[in-house]
Amino acid sequence: MSTDGMSTPLMVLGTSSGAGKSLMSAALCRLLLRRGETPIPFKGQNMSNNAWVDESGGEMAYSQALQAWAAGLKPQCAMNPVLLKPQGDSTSEVIHLGQSVGTARAETYYEQWFRPGWSVIREALKDLQCSYTHGRLVLEGAGSPVEVNLQRRDLTNLRLAQFLRARCLLVADIERGGVFAQIIGTLSLLKPVEKQLIRGLLINRFRGRRELFDEGRDWLEAETGIPVIGVMPWLEELFPPEDSLDLLERRGKKNDAEIEIAVLKLPSLSNFSDLDPLEAEPTVQLRWVEPGTFLGTPDAVIIPGSKQTLRDLNSLNRSGLGSQLQTYAQSGGHVFGICGGMQMLGRTLADPLGLEGVTTTDPSSSMAGLNLLPLDTVFKRSKALKQCQRITQWPDNAKVKGFELHHGNSQLIQGSHESVLPMADDPSLGWVSKNERCGQVAGTYLHGIFENGRWRRLWLNLIRKQKGLADLPTDIPHHEQQREQLLNRLTDVFEEHVNINPLLGT
């Protein structure tokens, strides 16, 4: 593909999943922006349930939204034209250019979806080229670029690199161990024409003094003929991992934590970036709780979003965690549900089309919810996809913004209006029901609710008041300002430890 007028594309590949491609791509975007360029993030195909909704109402992976912010651009679904959202049983929802186009099984995906996917990727590239005629594409690969059984129908790695004649950076995670085998093994599986695209190696998550790796750097450069352009130090995780399996290992204890919030780690957990602003609160300790483990006595519980709401609800009930949560709420505990989490708090959930992992023998029947909010939810094929701005009336007045992303339509049970208050000026956005013993159960469809600084602090102060703690200041900015600071911090470290000139050909 011709990229006339645009600078030569760059591509970040990894020796494995979790090597750090997403954050290195974000850092590269921000560094190029600092140098006066217009970087354009792009990942042809991503598999993730951590999604974002752009201004047009299109779904895309959160990691590409983050890279867009790093590039100083508004996220748009063309930056991630193919999104696969796993939903269990080796199936995924297929999103093309922001819209759902069907469901695919793993064993037949490439047979059925390769050609449509490649067509959509090329269309998205043309759109971006028209929008940013003098920009530079910053491409992110997926997993390893040398999965031999998948290379023939690769949509994300070397096919795209060759198509765009991109200069590639290969990232390896030394924290996992075996970094030399990772790099040499990856390069040995590349064809000569593919290996020529690799212009630099990057060692990620190195602990200790950089000079301790000098011998390793020299050996790699002599063995491969490719420069090691950087050794990135190990950093405390700044942003959520792409894979929810990494969540339990992410964080340690906070010395200054004053309240503990338990977050249910659902089997089909989605949009866990919703919790980032709480993770960034120095006085808040998040504790992830899996089905089958003990809930304990946290100061509050959050049920996050789910890609398979009914299946996850069934998991909570079978494991006993659902009944623990009911007891906790009825004893005065604070419970907050986001999207699918709010739906689980309701009375019933009906999934006549089998969209959310129905586990009953009769798909037309409904499943009992946790019955902590008087809501009935029906899942429909049409999906609510939109950004929105509202004014809340609970816990107090606050301007909030975020996005909706859900199949379910929730309605209050007739006659329950006196016991439940709408959370915002849009009554369908969420509800709150006060417990008899001071705690409150509430839920919302608004993803990103905790990014709103004033609202987040108002909610935390409800919990703090019940513990006899002083209120936190509520006159604080939106989390996007803190995200900017984190991106700048990441890029400062990247700029100090990585020389991108060989990648740029200078």
Curated annotation (Swiss-Prot):
Gene3D superfamilies in alphabetical order: 3.40.50.880, P-loop containing nucleotide triphosphate hydrolases
Presence of keyword Transport:
no
Q: Pfam families, per this entry?
A: CbiA, GATase_3
BP GO terms, sorted = cobalamin biosynthetic process
What pathway does the annotation place this protein in?
Answer: Cofactor biosynthesis; adenosylcobalamin biosynthesis
- The GATase cobBQ-type domain extends over 258-455
The record's active-site residues are C339, H447
Keywords from the named record: Cobalamin biosynthesis, Glutamine amidotransferase
GO molecular function, a single term: ABC-type vitamin B12 transporter activity
What's this protein's function? Catalyzes amidations at positions B, D, E, and G on adenosylcobyrinic A,C-diamide. NH(2) groups are provided by glutamine, and one molecule of ATP is hydrogenolyzed for each amidation.
Q: Which family does it belong to?
A: Belongs to the CobB/CobQ family. CobQ subfamily.
Q: Which NCBIfam families match?
A: cobQ, PRK00784.1
Name under which the protein is recorded: Cobyric acid synthase
